[in-house]
Design a protein with these regions (language model features):
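Short helix-capping/linker segments at secondary-structure and domain boundaries
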Residues: 85-87, 124-125
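Buried hydrophobic packing segments
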Residues: 58, 80, 117-121
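Conserved beta-strand -> loop -> alpha-helix junction used to position metal-binding or nucleic-acid-contacting
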Residues: 68-81
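Arginine residue identity/basic-tract feature
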Residues: 63, 82-83, 122
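Acidic two-metal-ion nuclease catalytic site recognized across multiple nuclease folds
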Residues: 99, 118-125
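Conserved catalytic/binding loops enriched for acidic/polar residues
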Residues: 113
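Conserved non-catalytic scaffold segment of RNase H-like nuclease domains
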Residues: 1-71, 86-108
Length: 125
């Protein structure tokens, strides 16, 4: 977990993600976590299911800490899923994951969502 700035969770976010400020009181702030993550990414592309949302969040945290945003190549599994799986009832992460053979049991948990997105990317990108 990363401590957000400010370390505040509104009711909706707590309901969706199951987190509150006590969960992140002792968590590191973004610049410390980024220093560990950035060398692992190097120049690899990023992948998200709904790129505009995730990239917007990532850009916002870089702005908060006055850090230069590294302009990574960024793929969107949501956009691609609409093109290659047009007959799905919807294109929510859990629906697309299931169509690709992955059962997402803990939706809105960051690691579970990332694993589902990676599975989808491997199947349709």
């Amino acid at each position: 977990l990363i401590q957000p700035e400010p370390n505040y969770y509104n009711y909706w976010c707590s309901q969706v993600h199951g987190l509150c400020h006590e969960d992140t009181d002792d968590a590191p702030v973004f610049p410390k976590v980024w220093a560990q993550i950035e060398p692992l990414i190097e120049n690899l592309p990023l992948v998200a299911h709904n790129k505009p949302f995730d990239e917007g969040c990532l850009k916002a945290v870089f702005r908060v800490y006055q850090m230069d945003y590294p302009d990574y190549e960024f793929y969107d599994t949501l956009c691609v899923s609409r093109r290659v799986l047009p007959d799905l009832e919807n294109h929510q992460l859990q629906t697309v994951a299931a169509a690709c053979g992955y059962m997402l049991d803990n939706h809105h948990h960051a690691l579970a969502d990332a694993e589902a997105c990676a599975w989808i990317a491997r199947e349709i990108l």
